[in-house]
From Swiss-Prot:
Protein name: C-X-C chemokine receptor type 3
Matching Pfam families: 7tm_1
GO biological-process terms attached to the record: angiogenesis; calcium-mediated signaling; G protein-coupled receptor signaling pathway; inflammatory response; negative regulation of execution phase of apoptosis; positive regulation of angiogenesis; positive regulation of cell population proliferation; positive regulation of chemotaxis
Species: Mus musculus
Complexes and interactors: Homomer. Forms heteromers with ACKR4. Interacts with PF4/CXCL4.
Length: 367
């Protein structure tokens, strides 16, 4: 959240590894003396006090909810792992990504409340891990959307031949791209001592141009492109489902709308604030201390809304997805009868079929 006057711009990563926007000075500290402004950096008391109070409480709550909710989703899917469709497999990877993301939240809660006490190595790992799973969540939702689009709109199953191999390769590509986008975290993140704060924080050592370019990349690749893919695919899916008949199809349509709307509602406010900050960086909008303080607080609040998306998907499955509730109940029943010879309520072959390539019925989670 701060800039250190040096040959390189140093950014605090208290808003996590992928949030490079919390620059609190309007001045570009370059390598040349002429780059320095005669005015001092903006005071940070208001935004700092807000972050120290708001972020640790929020991150702790999201950690508990996200771990329990996504753990339940993973348990349900793994209990049916021999009959998972392509959508179910993507959802399993999405739950894993959300779990790994929320596991970093306690570290960043400590960083926001006190300082970074976990060393430079864990700084790089935690920052990269958060960034990897931020991208993975968006990319996997886009994969689910495209898979449903082909299966419903074009009646095409791209995973019909060797489905597990093809789905696995798709997931490997997704995780590989996420790792590629997280390389700046491994390179530029470090635990740096900030003299103005008298504290050590997990920070980026970034030149201004690199900071702006990476934030634009994250805005486009991590939000706009996945959102456009989801909107396009689900708009065509809804067009097909609306002309169909049957209550089952309308239940599937309802959850489709809710899932894509949740992604948009959770992440749009944050990325709009980031866009404003980018426009101030490039000089399109004037930067002053009052506006900068408001933007910093807005980023803390809206980023919290974005992180809530990790906890929201399991709730959507539970309250909107009928099949998820059924499978969760069956899992609890089997666990309660583990001392018996076997579960008495195994789903029939017709109920176990979850791929939309053969039917518009939802997967195990109702998608």
């Amino acid at each position: 959240m701060y800039l250190e006057v040096s040959e390189r711009q140093v950014l605090d990563a208290s808003d996590f590894a992928f949030l490079l926007e919390n620059s609190t000075s309007p001045y570009d500290y370059g390598e040349n003396e002429s780059d320095f402004s005669d005015s001092p950096p903006c005071p940070q008391d208001f935004s700092l006090n807000f972050d120290r109070t708001f972020l640790p409480a929020l991150y702790s709550l999201l950690f508990l909810l996200g771990l329990l909710g996504n753990g339940a989703v993973a348990a349900v899917l793994l209990s049916q792992r021999t009959a998972l469709s392509s959508t179910d497999t993507f959802l399993l990877h999405l739950a894993v990504a959300d779990v790994l993301l929320v596991l970093t939240l306690p570290l960043w809660a400590v960083d926001a409340a006190v300082q970074w006490v976990f060393g430079p190595g864990l700084c790089k790992v935690a920052g990269a891990l958060f960034n990897i799973n931020f991208y993975a969540g968006a990319f996997l939702l886009a994969c689910i959307s495209f898979d449903r689009y082909l299966s419903i709109v074009h009646a095409t199953q791209i995973y019909r031949r060797d489905p597990r191999v093809r789905v696995a390769l798709t997931c490997i590509v997704v995780w590989g791209l996420c790792l590629l986008f997280a390389l700046p975290d491994f390179i530029y993140l470090s635990a740096n001592y900030d003299q103005r704060l008298n504290a050590t924080h997990c920070q980026y050592n970034f030149p201004q141009v690199g900071r702006t370019a990476l934030r634009v990349l994250q805005l486009v690749a991590g939000f706009l492109l996945p959102l456009l893919v989801m909107a396009y695919c689900y708009a065509h899916i809804l067009a097909v489902l609306l002309v169909s008949r049957g209550q089952r199809r309308f239940r599937a349509m309802r959850l489709v709308v809710v899932v894509v709307a949740a992604f948009a509602v959770c992440w749009t406010p944050y990325h709009l604030v980031v866009l404003v900050d980018i426009l101030m960086d490039v000089g399109v909008l004037a930067r002053n201390c009052g506006r900068e303080s408001h933007v910093d607080v807005a980023k803390s609040v809206t980023s919290g809304m974005g992180y809530m998306h990790c906890c929201l998907n399991p709730l959507l499955y539970a309250f909107v997805g009928v099949k998820f509730r059924e499978q969760m109940w069956m899992l609890f029943t089997r666990l309660g009868r583990s001392d018996q010879r076997g579960p008495q309520r195994q789903p029939s072959s017709s109920r176990r079929e979850s791929s939309w390539s053969e039917t518009t019925e939802a997967s195990y989670l109702g998608l």
